[in-house]
């Protein structure tokens, strides 16, 4: 039985194109497929190379520069160990590859180029009228203002939180959200318990802890905020980090200097106080204040150390690890780089 003519012609047409496809320009289909695979492999490898280079460039650009400025030696041994402290913190931050940490010892750097392209600058030093920021008739304050204007993070730790209100109070409130003010704030040595933390990158992985230090409180915050609750004040987003309520005995003194007590400190009994806080500024920069750090040996406390390390990473706009910055210290590392001081 013969197929209809139209069916036979269709079958012949199909066989012609099938055979044509198997032998184009003298190549069989296997040759074509092999050549196509070679081209695909080359293109794929080229694409992978481009992607890898782009990732490396992006990763390099993501590295943040943090500068820690330590003050000159002061106080008895193992107190106000600013030089040893910044070197210890820099060592611990080596576990965070996105942050390149540099430090300055013994006060203001002789070469200010270290501040060029810094993403964050932190001052751990004596403050008040001798604060390194207020010297040179305001020139350094203007320099720091230029950093803030371009979004550089600024942090102050322990005595570095204190400035004379008329000299630099407005600047510190603008940059970090507040400052220690003589005769308004107080500086007792006491042992608060930090039991609860806000949800914030600075508190990642931090567990409740209790530690004795010269914890300043009743800070002069921007807009006269009490400082114990998150708030928006002007161009700042304010977030307390370490908060605890001093006992009446702590409020009654003595404080380190002047010994007090101050009536307004006693009148605020029962009120929780912020001893560490962070701010986000409208210029895109961040700031933080930390009033602990008097006793050098406190850096051996994992939680105390972690909350500060987290804050340094956050200040530089790097990503704080999910469980916080991990670090370990040996006694030898804690004892390293201490200032030569006469025993008292």
Describe each PLM feature range:
Residues 66-70, 115-166, 290:
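Short alpha-beta junction capping motif
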Residues 61-64, 70, 85-91, 95, ...:
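Extracellular ligand-binding/catalytic regions of CAZymes and related secreted enzymes
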Residues 156-256, 324-344:
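An acidic, glycine-rich "communication" segment
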């Amino acid at each position: 039985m013969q197929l209809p003519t139209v069916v036979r012609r269709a079958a012949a047409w199909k066989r012609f194109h099938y055979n044509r496809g198997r032998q184009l320009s003298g190549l069989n289909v296997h040759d074509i497929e092999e050549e196509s695979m070679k081209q695909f492999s080359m293109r794929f490898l080229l694409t992978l190379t481009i992607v890898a280079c782009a990732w490396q460039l992006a990763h390099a650009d993501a590295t943040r520069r943090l500068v820690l400025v330590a003050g000159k030696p002061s106080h008895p041994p193992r107190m106000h160990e600013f030089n040893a402290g910044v070197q210890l913190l820099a060592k611990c931050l080596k576990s965070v590859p996105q942050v390149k940490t540099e430090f300055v010892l013994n006060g203001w750097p002789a070469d200010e180029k270290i501040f060029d392209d810094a993403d964050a600058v932190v001052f751990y030093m004596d403050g008040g009228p001798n604060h390194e920021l207020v010297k040179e008739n305001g020139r350094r304050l203007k320099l720091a203002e230029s950093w803030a204007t371009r979004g550089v993070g600024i942090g102050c730790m322990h005595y570095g939180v204190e400035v004379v209100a008329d000299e630099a109070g407005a600047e510190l409130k603008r940059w970090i959200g507040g400052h220690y003010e003589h005769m308004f704030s107080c500086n007792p040595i006491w042992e608060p318990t930090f039991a609860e933390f806000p949800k914030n990158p600075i508190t990642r992985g931090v567990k409740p802890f209790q530690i004795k230090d010269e914890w300043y409180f009743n800070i002069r915050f921007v807009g006269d905020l009490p400082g114990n609750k998150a708030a928006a004040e002007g161009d700042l987003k304010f977030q307390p980090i370490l908060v605890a309520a001093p006992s009446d005995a702590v409020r009654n003194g003595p404080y380190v200097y002047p010994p007090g007590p101050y009536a307004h400190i006693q009148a605020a009994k029962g009120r929780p106080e912020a001893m560490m806080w962070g701010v986000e500024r409208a210029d895109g920069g961040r700031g933080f204040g930390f009033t602990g750090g008097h006793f050098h040996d406190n850096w051996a406390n994992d939680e105390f150390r972690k909350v500060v390390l987290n804050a340094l990473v956050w200040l530089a706009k790097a990503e704080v690890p999910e469980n916080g910055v991990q670090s370990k210290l040996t006694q030898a590392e804690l004892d390293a780089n201490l200032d030569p001081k006469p025993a008292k």
